[in-house]
A protein has these predicted regions:
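Metal-dependent polysaccharide deacetylase catalytic core of the NodB/CE4 family, i.e.
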Residues: 18-19, 29, 40-168
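Catalytic grooves of carbohydrate-active enzymes
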Residues: 152-194
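Charged catalytic carboxylate motif
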Residues: 34, 93, 176
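N-terminal pre-catalytic segment of deacetylase/amide-hydrolase enzymes
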Residues: 1-22, 27-42, 57-60, 179-194
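Hydrophobic alpha-helical transmembrane segments of integral membrane proteins
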Residues: 2, 105, 174-175
Length: 194
């Protein structure tokens, strides 16, 4: 996959023992506040790739995320699937979200978009960020124990770890997050934002 997207951030500095927790799809009142509470309790900052329409609908959560010092990324305005629309429509949706979120940090929904869409966003100054560790917290077939095995096996210096603040992930992420933070700290990792 990384060969298909060479101008995309998959992982940060491999020489530093830092990891980057990221959350996609929010903010939503059903779980974003609880995630923020957990992060605050552990003194961890994360990066939130937000859907623009959610950020507008739940502006108080966008404000809280900003106030608490987390990084903000763009996840399109309507959670658009890039492979199902043209370049102009996709870029327009990203730009609409950018006006709300005030960021040039971008992650495509589902981690997928077309090459022409990627090129157009890079030309407009966006930094496109994917991940090297996906927790699968949105998938009810996976247990929290399985997700922790993934974290233990694949996290390394500079890892970008993708989680979700969504209805699909709610129960699993709220159980996983404290365990994951405690484990990563025990391994000597620091947490940073993108």
């Amino acid at each position: 996959m990384q060969r298909l997207y060479p101008n995309v951030v998959w992982r940060k500095d491999k020489t530093q023992k830092k990891v980057y927790l990221t959350f996609d799809d929010g903010p939503i009142p059903e779980c974003t506040p609880q995630i923020l509470d957990i992060l605050k309790a552990y003194g961890v900052k994360a990066s939130f790739f937000m859907v623009g329409e959610n950020a507008v609908r739940y502006g108080q959560l966008l404000a809280r995320i900003r106030e608490e010092g987390h990084a903000i990324g763009n996840h399109t305005y309507h959670h658009l699937r890039g492979w199902k629309c043209g370049v102009d429509a996709y870029v327009e949706d990203v730009e609409k979200a950018s006006k709300v979120l005030e960021t040039k940090l971008f992650r495509p929904p589902h981690g997928r978009m077309g090459g022409r869409q990627k090129k157009a966003l890079l030309e407009r100054g966006y930094t496109i960020c994917l991940w090297d560790v996906l927790t699968h917290d949105y998938n009810s077939r996976y247990t929290v124990e399985h997700m922790m095995r993934v974290v233990r096996k694949y996290v390394r210096n500079g890892s970008i770890i993708t989680c979700h603040d969504s209805l699909k992930s709610k129960d699993r992420i709220l159980e996983l997050l404290p365990q994951m933070i405690a484990y990563l700290r025990s391994e000597g990792y620091e947490f940073a934002t993108l």
